[in-house]
């Protein structure tokens, strides 16, 4: 039986761009990832899918890259030939993943092993968990409702495309929904439908398999885990963001120039994002906190550095839908180029409450790492002492309790 994942390209581009840096610059790094479901409740306990998940993981770990897939990766100018040679030999190892349950019906997943392996599991496992969960809830009415919502989005994008002023910076969206999609076939249907409705607006997808299949641009640079790893590498904690950005610049020499800002919060990020980085990077990505406040801070920072912000890109990717994205574009279009990565609202808007699931890096080389998100609910670590130390080092206040 073919598994839910049938190609190792069926993941987000940034897994490849981050793994290339890991292979070239710190290949010996060991890491631990842990699964969380942030939903207060689910229709049925996630523990119920444990056995099916184990079967899917076994199938996933049989996959290898095909020559056609490797040729596609080789065609991306920022992917280096030695990395493709490595991927030709690559196979995920099942022994690095443990799946368990607890007496509250929760699903526990731990990935522990070399980062060059562990990092690559994340998107696959999240997509598998989603598809297994929603498979039991699927009815013709669910698909019908999903289609109704999708057609409404397509109609809205047509309206926006017609209203765009060609003399203004364009409104561009991308699919960022692989990790929480309903299923692959639905994700492809969504992208095809929106591309047909508004080809001038749909810029691409983070999913490499679908980018290749549909002939559109694969989108992505870095995730939080890349920057977090530097909290445990051979640099002073205070300098981890600078070290991570320097490492990225060394690898990509001007390509993939969008920096993620919320590992220890926007204010702490901007203290490290000096003139050197501000000139080198094409722009910034927002993934937590108030996007308007965040963008205004970015604008003030570029103004202070005497950089024309209209040459820079703000990418937004936190809980977006088309209306929120369009409103943000209207607010920032005269000051920045903008881009919007829309995830769950595109690929899993079927009428059911989506799963809010994550698989996050919590340790690197045996040392805790953490994210001090601009949204308190997104902060994740298994070490409260380290979290407090990180707050102290970067002068990040404790979030106010409601």
Curated annotation (Swiss-Prot):
Q: Which GO terms describe its biological process?
A: NAD biosynthetic process via the salvage pathway
Identify the keywords attached in UniProt to this record, alphabetized: Ligase, Phosphoprotein, Pyridine nucleotide biosynthesis
One GO molecular-function entry: nicotinate phosphoribosyltransferase activity
Q: Which positions bear Phosphohistidine?
A: 224
Reactions performed catalytically: nicotinate + 5-phospho-alpha-D-ribose 1-diphosphate + ATP + H2O = nicotinate beta-D-ribonucleotide + ADP + phosphate + diphosphate
Q: Sorted alphabetically, which CDD domains does this protein's record hold? A: PncB_like
Known Pfam families for this protein?
NAPRTase, NAPRTase_N
What pathway annotation does it carry?
A: Cofactor biosynthesis; NAD(+) biosynthesis; nicotinate D-ribonucleotide from nicotinate: step 1/1
By sequence similarity, the record places it as follows: Belongs to the NAPRTase family.
What NCBIfam families does its record include?
A: NAPRTase, PRK05321.1
Q: What is this protein called?
A: Nicotinate phosphoribosyltransferase
What species does this protein belong to? Answer: Neisseria meningitidis serogroup A / serotype 4A (strain DSM 15465 / Z2491)
